């Protein structure tokens, strides 16, 4: 399971020109699922995201988690995080889990974040989405569990 994490001052996701999820200050997280992932990875990722210390403290140092600053999280499913570009010019997607396996696991990540007290908005699974992000820092990290 992979997550591309961006610290944001705001983020939103739209489907067919309608905003389906938006957050203020916090994190925008793109989540990719691979074949061997399961509930344990989903829970571990939710815990790492909730505790990841990339939010600024009063001295401007990345020392606080999104939980500690009452931040919000936008979660967007992103199968392309498992794109393989080692051969040719067109990515291969064989490492990405199919939707029947991936969707419940993304939902488990969202549930795990909510269980940890976070406000979470989401995109729409399998939809063509437009994501608007105001990246702070910029601070962008890749997590893998």
Model-derived features: positions:
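GST superfamily/GST-like fold recognition
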Residues: 119, 126, 130-134
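RNA/tRNA-interacting regions in translation and RNA-turnover enzymes
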Residues: 9-11
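Residue-level signal for inorganic ion chemistry
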Residues: 45, 76, 139
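C-terminal edge-of-domain segments
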Residues: 131-144
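Active-site pocket-lining segment
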Residues: 71-80
């Amino acid at each position: 399971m992979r997550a591309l994490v961006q610290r944001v001052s705001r983020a939103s996701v739209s489907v067919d020109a309608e905003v389906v999820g938006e957050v203020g200050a916090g994190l925008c997280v793109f989540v990719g699922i691979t074949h061997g992932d399961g509930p344990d990875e989903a829970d571990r990722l939710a815990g790492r995201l909730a505790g990841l210390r990339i939010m600024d403290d009063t001295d401007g140092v990345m020392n606080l988690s999104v939980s500690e600053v009452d931040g919000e999280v936008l979660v967007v499913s992103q199968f392309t995080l498992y794109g393989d570009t080692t051969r040719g010019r067109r990515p291969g997607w064989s490492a990405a889990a199919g939707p029947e396996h991936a969707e419940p696991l993304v939902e488990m990540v969202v549930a795990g974040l909510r269980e940890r007290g976070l406000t979470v908005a989401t995109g729409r699974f399998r939809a063509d989405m437009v994501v608007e992000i105001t990246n702070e820092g910029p601070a962008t990290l890749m997590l893998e569990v």
